[in-house]
Amino acid sequence: MNISGIKDCYGCGVCATVCARQIIDIALNENGFLEPRITDEGKCTNCRLCVDVCSYSHKELSLKASCVKSFAAWSKDAAVRRKCSSGGVGFEVGRTLIGEGYKVCGVRYNAERNRAEHYVATTIEELIPSIGSKYIQSYTVDGFKAINRNEKYLVTGTPCQIDSFRRYLQKFKKEDNFVLLDFFCHGVPSKLMWDKYVHWAEKQVGSLTYVSWRNKFTGWHDSWAMAIDGSEKGESVKWHESYNLSIREKKSFLNTRLSQGDMFYRLFLSDACLGKACYEKCKFKYENSSADIRIGDLWGTTYQDDEKGISGAIAFTDKGNNLLMKANLECVEHPLSVVAEGQMKECAHRPFFYKKLMTLLKDNSLDIEVIMLRSGGYLKSVSYTHLTLPTNREV
């Protein structure tokens, strides 16, 4: 038995990581989502490892835990807090563990390959590209395969990625070597949509060299913003005005926000083109997690006047709680209802025009501006301060 019959799954890539025969490939399907395929059935030994580590194939989570403590949290380092999407908890956890001899498997955006991808960082400098949210599906395989199970790691990812990865660690009895961190996940949009958005951006700034999905130029509550560096030479951009932490030369620069009608965010936050599993089979909303720590924006009324950024942080294990206490963080304990107030309580609902939108996204002759004109009237109104509004179900 293997994962050959699985379609429209989470695309976490752990099956490809665990396969000793190296016959599982993770690639984009026709709708622009990662999924596995067996490249040579004849070499399969039916060891079942790929199925055993597959979160999509199990109803229960791999960690039977409940919230130990929940916090509002933010970095004590003002520069870190300013550059991170919310409060900087993820970076501070990584920085603390690197100081203790851990490596970090996090996510960066690879502009040359136009994808988010997992990679291994061993120094603080190498950790910097992991700063900030990346609201597209991450290719995990190379990063996960680079991990040595006998060493100590922090591994971050979406809840489904982390649930599968914990199953992988349990198979080899290596959980003690790892700290696992996930986040409140909205779902992942189709790569077809992202590719069209990139094409639109490149017409303005040339080939992309860096992308940031969030910035606080106008405050944390208006931080749903794309900040993009292009290859074309442009006006000088001061370092503190760019979200690229490594900018060193004149580059063209694009900044577009949800509050100004940014097309990526209009489609993404309207739940218009998420993966099938995000609509139908996500079991990780609210406090359901297999991680030691879950993080995300602490939206809601308690910190509605804060514009520097506040993270919600939930410890599901004593390991996670102890780590939050010793990291360079200001932590204020709150009930879970406060920490997760603005987060999704259930799966997104597939809109009735989903199939039509996917057809438009597959049409190579259509730019994203045309697609927005044809579908914009169907998109729900999205408030950038509260993202759990209802939408029409598919009929």
Where are these regions (language model features)?
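Ferredoxin-like iron-sulfur electron-transfer modules
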Residues: 1-13, 24-46, 74, 260-266, ...
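Iron-sulfur cluster-binding cysteine motifs and their immediate structural context
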Residues: 2, 14-37, 48-66, 288, ...
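Local cysteine-cluster metal-coordination motifs and their immediate loop/turn environment
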Residues: 7-21, 45-56, 161, 274-286
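A short alpha->loop->secondary-structure connector
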Residues: 171-182
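Conserved small/polar residues in nucleotide/adenosyl-binding loops
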Residues: 385-391
